[in-house]
């Protein structure tokens, strides 16, 4: 009498696929930090942006990442100029 040993092993756990979703980058908190008519101290950030959506005007500096900041303490003013462009300036109070 001959026995034929035929063993078959089956998976005890079902194979599970992976997903390519489920992650996101942190928001950069871009936009206006000071509104029109608000007081800004020298060195304070007025507008965080990528590119020059808002252009620097009088008493406003532009950082390496295009962030606009006040060079002097004063009142923030936004104004339109040119063809659909916006500029921000800081008006120092009269002494």
From Swiss-Prot:
PROSITE patterns: RIBOSOMAL_L27
Domain of life the protein comes from: Bacteria
Free-text description of this protein's post-translational modifications in UniProt: The N-terminus is cleaved by ribosomal processing cysteine protease Prp.
InterPro entries xrefs: Ribosomal_bL27, Ribosomal_bL27_CS
A GO CC term attached to the entry: cytosolic large ribosomal subunit
Propeptide: 1-10
Keywords per UniProt: Ribonucleoprotein, Ribosomal protein
Gene Ontology BP terms: translation
SUPFAM superfamilies referenced in this protein's UniProt entry, alphabetically: Ribosomal L27 protein-like (SSF110324)
Spans through the membrane: none
Any one Gene Ontology molecular-function term assigned to this protein's record: structural constituent of ribosome
Family, per entry: Belongs to the bacterial ribosomal protein bL27 family.
Name of the protein in question: Large ribosomal subunit protein bL27
């Amino acid at each position: 009498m001959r026995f034929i040993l035929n063993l078959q092993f089956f998976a005890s756990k079902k194979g599970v696929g992976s997903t390519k979703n489920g992650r996101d980058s942190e928001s950069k908190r871009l936009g206006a930090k000071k509104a029109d008519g608000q007081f800004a101290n020298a060195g304070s950030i007025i507008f965080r942006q990528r590119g020059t959506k808002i252009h620097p005007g009088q008493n406003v500096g532009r950082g390496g990442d295009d962030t606009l900041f006040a060079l002097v303490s004063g009142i923030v003013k936004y104004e339109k100029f040119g063809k659909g462009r916006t500029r921000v300036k800081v008006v120092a109070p009269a002494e």
